[in-house]
Regions:
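Acidic, low-complexity central loop/insert segments
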Residues: 21-144
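Glycine-centered loop/turn motifs
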Residues: 2-3, 84-92, 206-212, 251
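Glycine-rich, small/acidic residue-mixed loop/short-helix segments
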Residues: 162-170, 184-276
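Acidic, proline/glycine-enriched N-terminal capping motif
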Residues: 1-19, 23
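Intrinsic-disorder/low-complexity, polar/charged segments enriched in Ser/Thr/Lys/Arg/Asp/Glu/Gln
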Residues: 28, 63, 108, 181, ...
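Anionic-ligand-binding alpha/beta catalytic cores of soluble enzymes and soluble regulatory domains
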Residues: 110-200
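Residue-level recognition of beta-strand microenvironments
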Residues: 59, 102, 145, 175, ...
Length: 276
């Protein structure tokens, strides 16, 4: 009850169908993921219910979902919500509210609560905090190197390509799960040729999940794919992209959409790659 888990679900070939955060509240487990992925996950999980005494349903109307982040976020939230989780992924909760501490460049919390409590929190936090849209939270996920799978990237990556092994998002010791053989083989026997990088781009149009990445002078052969993208407060766009390691760490420029598209500049993730 005091721990959440960032995770994913794979197809038999070990490719990610979705990524999400799992937490327990009351007598249920909840998965937090993009609304566009709900039907995919429900349809997949229903295959494994068999005769189990389990119900599976969309829970979008169960909670109001809020995010609070910033250098003063912890104290501001503590003043109105009381006890907060101390460590990343930990959860504090009562019968109808859960607060999860999540990775971020600043202290960051996700809150799942009732409509009435959400109104009270919003009113109290709005005194010193600035309300922003969900796209701003997507930017924070990108800065933290947290990959969310969307319909455009469904089944495009094995977990290691999206860095799940670096953010405690995949287990190599637990029991069977779909695609486990492929995922384990990649971890212990394979050589990873693609992984996820954080990047910046001054594109004149909004980059989208699934957009292709190219290298200068290499024609129409894509070397990677965007995982997610969001406007950067200082202009341009911040992105996560799964790229060929050889291309990302080579000397040629990376471009969005075509070999002559907007230039992509790589940035450091907040966690190291194993070789670093």
């Amino acid at each position: 009850d005091q721990h959440s888990q960032f995770s994913g679900i794979c197809n038999p070939k070990g490719r990610l169908l979705a990524s999400f955060r799992v937490f327990h509240c009351g007598d249920s487990y909840y998965l937090c993921l993009p609304s566009s992925m709900i039907e995919t996950v429900i349809s997949r999980l229903r295959r494994f219910m068999l005769r189990s005494k389990v119900t599976l349903e969309e829970a979008s109307d169960t909670f109001v979902h809020l995010g609070v982040s910033g250098s003063e976020a912890e104290q501001a939230l503590r003043n109105v919500a009381g006890t907060l989780p101390d460590n990343i992924h930990e959860v504090t909760q009562n019968k109808d509210q859960a607060i999860i501490r999540v990775p971020g460049i600043h202290p960051s919390f996700e809150i799942f609560t009732t409509t009435e409590q959400a109104r009270q929190l919003w009113s109290s936090l709005n005194v010193q905090s600035a309300p922003v849209g969900s796209i701003a939270w997507q930017f924070l996920d990108i800065q933290a190197g947290i990959p969310m799978i969307f319909p455009e990237t469904r089944e495009a990556f094995v977990p290691q390509m999206a860095n799940l092994q670096l953010i405690d998002g995949v287990s190599f010791t637990k029991g069977c799960y779909t695609g486990q053989e492929i995922v384990a083989r990649m971890q212990y026997l394979g050589k990873l040729k693609r992984r996820m990088y954080r990047a910046r781009c001054e594109s004149t149009t909004q980059p989208l999940a699934g957009d292709e990445v190219y290298v200068s002078g290499e024609g129409t052969q894509s070397v990677g794919k965007l995982v997610s993208a969001a406007p950067h407060p200082d202009g341009g766009y911040s992105m996560l992209a799964v790229l060929q390691i050889s291309s990302a760490e080579g000397k040629s420029r990376l471009h969005l959409g075509s070999a002559s598209g907007a230039v992509i500049t790589l940035e450091h993730l907040p966690y190291p790659f194993p070789s670093e």
